[in-house]
């Protein structure tokens, strides 16, 4: 059937005298390029022979130069041309291929990550060097210990605020919003990239409890966006929004992969924290780029002689034959449950700190004027508490985060029955056993102090994350449980034939994964831990603890990233709660807004102005008439404002005055003499044609798509927006304000005294050919505008979306949430057999979900559910009335948006 159709099409084309061309539709149904082109050539040739047409290669040179037929030529010139064309296409296509893009992205991010780690290590070593060099003078040592991080944090905050304030914070909440379809201006630009990299390096080099993973997701996304712009020079495929979204999803995985050298965990973590629904076709992009980036990152460490070979970032040496006993599983479960409560408390504390600072208006205004004072004070407080000769000796204050993790993951036991073992521990491990305290007290103080310090430090307006501080706190908590188990079982766990000692380092690994998973609401932290440590021996305890921690934390608080989204008031859609069966009984008709801002197809400009005053939304519904409410499409607010501005523009008013002057100066023929009174002039002005196109004869022309119009419409709109602003002041104030301001009132009062003089000037200008422009009094302008507002609207001069997203009133809340999450829409119209009855936005959906989640165990019936029974009884009558609306519909012409190809793409 397909072959017959193709042959018939080729025959018809040949019969009409058209040049032979390849059938693109048929090409998608065959294997291989050569077979495909040969088949198309054979079918066209058969059609030509059957109809007796001329041979194409004996025709014009253009026919012989057809690309599809060049390879059948025998001349050397044709073969050279074929080779050059193929080489050009190969180079362009290969440079634009995904794997080239992903290799470049992974390489750049690995270089950035390694360079930042090197700079951070140098900064931390400088702080330690100054502290050790001044150990003879405690005051100078304290000043050096405190001043160094204060200077770095202050520089980071100031540099970020000056160059790009969008670089502040983690970046994962914003990327989650961007991947959902929201556009954040100046968030993926080059200056934001520079501010993020330099600011993050200074912030982490200060030694504050800040993280790197979240900002690196943002850095990788910016790198992908900039790389897409560069590669768009070779091929336009990267200019498409869908392709950019796919590359951003892969970039999020690269950010985690090159940060921890954990490609598998990076891909899974990026999916969990940024996506609700993930396209599986992007899986290979994320894994390929993350793996390549992690490989280059570790190769650079070997090249710099930091490592002997490619190994894990925090290599451990746990027992592989018997890593844990069955009797230890309850302890691992306790770690998971406690980490769940701890993660929820961390998110709550972080949010409360921000809310308290915002509610204190006096402090907030003072700190807003002194933007660098808050980060300096917080850094001063934390540095003072971590000063090693002072209180910092009881919380291992002299250790960096990397050194802390290395000591916490140590597989040797630090204590036996509460006392330090006589073992040759590394110098870093000695920091956990100060002279006047034991390991337990040091770990408890470390956990408590680092907990609130990390929650406070992550609120500093610098590029920073919270994953690494939480990871360290969880490792310390797990180490505390492990050391407690080692003290309770000093001889180890007895089995049938042997005894196995407790490994506290394994408990630290479990605690780190559990607390990090509880704060971020992810399970992939378990995989990240396996790749960080290089061992998978504790896979079962880690998975048990992470799952339990997630179960507890998700029932108490949102994730840290969702909490930041709410704090920053970004558009978000909360997840449906667990075990809330009443949300399946809530329908769209229970939560929708019934008073929908709309405009009718036959409305006037006055109706448009009223619709703009009623709502601040971005879209307005377009209906057939206020009686039928048949939804025809949606129109953007900017389009409506452009229509009103063009209708009341000074250029249009000058055009009417010029017509009026020509009518006054033209000699009367078979008509009465032109009136000279003021009222007659106003009558003539009001009776001029006031259609939007400016000419009376254009009102009956067929409607034209907005994207195919000539420059005349855009020129008139530009003149209307860039004309004389002083003469348009009254029009704009009457359009957007209920009453004129005091300055306008005083100007009107002053102009009343010279109205007669202005009217005389108008009459003189009407009788003179040398005056280029006539003037109108404010009263005449207002009267003219009132007349213009009563004119019908011609929607052919604006872009209309003929297929806005729609729902039916019986759609469940669960299904609506799934649709909004999957498609990334922010509003949907509710229709009943084509009739507009309501609208649902993210605000209504969010309120409904949060209301069902926070219900106090009582199954409350939806507020409008009581009307369903009565509505069901009258459904037949309602259906009959709605069907009756389709009969007497007036045949209005509805303009379409864009070209037919655009609408076809939308249908697909």
From Swiss-Prot:
Essential for channel gating by both voltage and cell volume: annotated span: 24-42
Transmembrane stretches, start-end: 96-129, 138-163, 188-206, 213-231, 283-303, 329-357, 366-385, 437-457, 465-488, 539-556
Lineage of source species: Eukaryota, Metazoa, Chordata, Craniata, Vertebrata
Lipoprotein keyword on record: no
Tissue-by-tissue expression: Expressed in the adrenal gland and brain. Expressed in intestinal epithelium (at protein level). Expressed in salivary gland (at protein level).
UniProt feature, compositional bias: Polar residues: 681-690, 711-722
Regulation: Common gate kinetics are down-regulated by intracellular ATP. Inhibited by AK-42, a derivative of meclofenamate. Inhibited by Cd(2+). Inhibited by Zn(2+) and PKC activation. Inhibited at acidic pH. CCLN2:HEPACAM channel conductance is up-regulated upon hypo-osmolarity.
Organism: Mus musculus (Mouse)
Protein name: Chloride channel protein 2
